[in-house]
Amino acid sequence: MNDILKRCTLCPRECKVNRYEHRGFCGETAKVRIARAELHMWEEPCISGTEGSGTVFFSGCCLKCCFCQNYEISAEGKGFELTEQELADTFLRLQSMGANNINLVNPTHFVPQIIKALDICKDKLTIPVVYNSGGYEKPQTLELLRGYVQIFLPDLKYFDPTLSDKYSKAADYFENAAASIHKMAELSGKPTFDEKGIMQSGTIVRHLVLPTHRKDSIKLMEWLGNNFAKDEIMISLMSQFTPVYKAFDYKELCRKTSTFEYNTVIDTVNKYGFEGFVQSRTSAAKDFIPKFYDEKYY
């Protein structure tokens, strides 16, 4: 499977770089790099619970979002290398700390290495694996995860290709995200939960409402409503937009999302009867951005 990395086509960019010798569009080589691995309390309640989600933040990214809160690791290269054995050990360490799941944040460009790590620890890892991504995926790559990942947590960022090109350098974002979310829902099946209300399988589609662009958000919610049964997926609507990184290059992004903008999108979700989560408006703060590291700290 690692032969994919010799001519990388894991993400829709299909940069075809030999990542054993060079960095791909994502900014990463074939060596796994992460910037944090800890219990994370700020995911959806059915993911974090009271014990926390065993979250592993991977360095690099196949998107170029101007408003990325994690820009230190997605764009600026922060992180440290791990072998696949060390990654497997990290998963088991998080499980031993009481994590409800192993939460892989921005994992797309490291899928082959993650699968190897999961194979190493498969006899000891007993909690669900969460694939937490920006939604810019290929169904063919997701198929590799069949039997390895139980929960998918994708973003669905944009409907309009003009916006996805402007803010994330990905004019083909929606077409790829749409196909991938269908694939994720097929792989995970309908949402299931344990006796504590912690998700064991299923897909939660996340959407961050951007200032000025509520109509694009509404189109996305309508698309979900027209393409999925209300019990097939869950929706998590986020209001945490805070101008950071290169968002200040765009006047329309130099503010937080208004209550009016957010509520009109909530109304659309409610119209289709989806179960899910609505984020508190107080979440829109830099205090919720975790600290990232350049070297092993545990």
Question: Where are the predicted features?
Answer:
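Auxiliary Fe-S-binding modules of radical SAM enzymes
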Residues: 1-23, 190-298
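Conserved Radical SAM active-site core
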Residues: 28-152, 160-162
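Hydrophobic faces of well-ordered beta-strands that scaffold small-molecule active sites
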Residues: 54, 102, 129-131, 152-154, ...
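Conserved radical SAM core fold
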Residues: 74, 111, 135-138, 156-174, ...
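Alpha-helix N-cap and loop-to-helix initiation/capping positions
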Residues: 82, 109, 168-176, 212, ...
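Conserved glycine-rich "GG(E/T)P / GGGxP" loop and the immediately following alpha-helix
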Residues: 95-121, 166, 172, 182, ...
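Alpha-helix-loop-beta-strand connector modules within alpha/beta enzyme cores
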Residues: 117-128, 180-184, 259-265
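Anionic-ligand binding region
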Residues: 165-196
